Amino acid sequence: MSRPFASAPARGHRQGQEERERRSEEGGSVPGPRTFQVVSPVVTPGQEATLFRVEAVEEGEARHEGDVAGIGREFQLLAEDIVEEVEVVADEEQEQRPSQELEEKTVEEQGQERPGGPCERQELDALQALAALQVELSSEREQNRRAYVQFMRKNHQRRKRHLARRSTIIQGIPGFWAKAIMSHPQVSVLISDQDQDFLGYMMDLKVQVRSHPPSRCKLIFSFRDNPYFLNSVIIKEYYLDITGYRARRSTPVHWFWDFERGAPSRRRDTRSLNFLNWLSGHNGPESNRIAEIISEDVWDDPLKYYLREEGSSVRDN
């Protein structure tokens, strides 16, 4: 690369020497040497020519010719350093330009893939299809729920009619419920002589199950006048959950005085679990199990246990 300032110091040196000689002969003062100050480069990228704006600053003291020559050489070195620095800057700019273009291209490609790329369009289509299918499933589930509720309502009404008719028929069979209860194999082992006597006063049994949470079961026993207690109705209520039956409450039994505090032969035997003790409280270890047997076995099919001792001739016919 050509260096435009290579010859400048030589010409400046000769012209400065002639000027000093001429002024010395004329008797005038010789101005001091000038220091050249580079103010700013004018760089044109990709071209070798480099222009500088140079200002001359006049010094107050005269220098020798050797000093002037030194200044010229310093200026030459300074110009060479500036040219080399400009070349390095230009090279760095050329190196940075391809990397910047590559980076811009990468960002551009990523921007094109994100908003409207094939993968995103596929995912959007799949989500739309899934949403449409979910609407259909929700609608079908709601229809099934309504159909189930309607079926259960109809089934409950039909069962209620059947139970009412069954109760009417059982009223014509004296001691039906007492015999059905005492004939169950798991209850029969608890029945005492006293139980057999007081169950003879039992008129009716009803079981009410509430399925809405919390699920509950009510056992309603109806009695005619008897020598044991004043109650005509005794209700035992239980909670129903995954663990089985759990006692909730029971109607307090109003015993006759002679049965509770009278002669020992008439007193209620509270030392063991029997049906009368179960009916009057929830303290027995098998209290919940007895409630489950009556509610799910005896109530669902009382005729099965009523005929247990007499055989199955009625069913066979």
UniProtKB/Swiss-Prot annotation:
Compartment annotation: Cytoplasm; Nucleus
Known tissue expression: Testis. Probably in spermatogonia.
Gene Ontology CC: one annotated term: nucleus
Main subcellular location of this protein, as a coarse class: cytoplasm
Region of interest (Disordered), ranges: 1-39, 91-118
A GO term for molecular function: histone binding
Entry-linked InterPro entries: NAP-like_sf, NAP_family
Alphabetically ordered keywords of this record: Cytoplasm, Developmental protein, Differentiation, Gonadal differentiation, Nucleus, Phosphoprotein, Spermatogenesis
Assigned protein family: Belongs to the nucleosome assembly protein (NAP) family.
Name the UniProt record assigns to this protein: Testis-specific Y-encoded protein 1
Annotated source species: Bos taurus
